[in-house]
């Protein structure tokens, strides 16, 4: 039993997430990035992506080019999750879910994950702390 998540965090403590059951595709990623742009209040978004195949798709690349004044995509080197602050959020989510009672359905798992993520979202200092990992210190922006 599993769910998938796409998420983005900011060094200002903002968290955006989307839970889903099937595979990520270009359309879902583009929809997620559009939602992030809408919440940025006219500021340009700088989004760090890992090397998932969909992150490099022609459709996503073309969309990013069309929206380059609103969003800029950066790709991490391959096999370097330690440089992605969002990975620390994912690990924290898994730890929190692991302490809860065993779920019986995917719906219960999704509800629990949503509850934990909403708690994280309400705690901007907690979200910001994902940028405090020693591997990220040289890149931390205040």
Can you say where each PLM-predicted feature lies in the sequence?
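Generic beta-sheet signal
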Residues: 43-49
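Acidic, metal-coordinating catalytic cores used for nucleic-acid/nucleotide bond scission
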Residues: 49-60, 78-83
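Alpha-helix C-cap/termination motif
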Residues: 39-40, 66-67, 119
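RNase H-like polynucleotidyl transferase catalytic core
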Residues: 65-85, 102
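C-terminal anion-handling pockets and recognition modules
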Residues: 86-142
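Electropositive, glycine- and tryptophan-enriched low-complexity nucleic-acid-binding patches
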Residues: 1-43
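Structural signal for conserved beta-strand scaffold positions within catalytic alpha/beta enzyme cores
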Residues: 17-19, 75, 99
């Amino acid at each position: 039993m599993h769910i998938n998540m796409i998420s983005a965090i900011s060094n200002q403590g903002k968290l955006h997430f989307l839970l889903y059951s099937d595979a990520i595709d270009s359309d879902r990623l583009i929809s997620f990035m559009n939602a992030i742009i809408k919440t940025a209040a006219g500021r340009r978004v700088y989004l760090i992506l890992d090397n998932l195949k969909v992150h490099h798709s022609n459709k996503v690349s073309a969309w990013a080019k069309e929206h380059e004044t609103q969003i800029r995509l950066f790709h991490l080197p391959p096999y370097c999750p330690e440089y992605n602050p969002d990975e620390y959020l994912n690990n924290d989510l898994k730890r929190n879910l692991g302490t809860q009672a065993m779920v019986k359905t995917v719906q219960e798992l999704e509800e629990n994950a949503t509850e934990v993520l909403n708690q994280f979202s309400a705690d901007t200092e907690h979200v910001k702390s994902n940028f405090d990992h020693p591997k990220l210190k040289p890149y931390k922006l205040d």
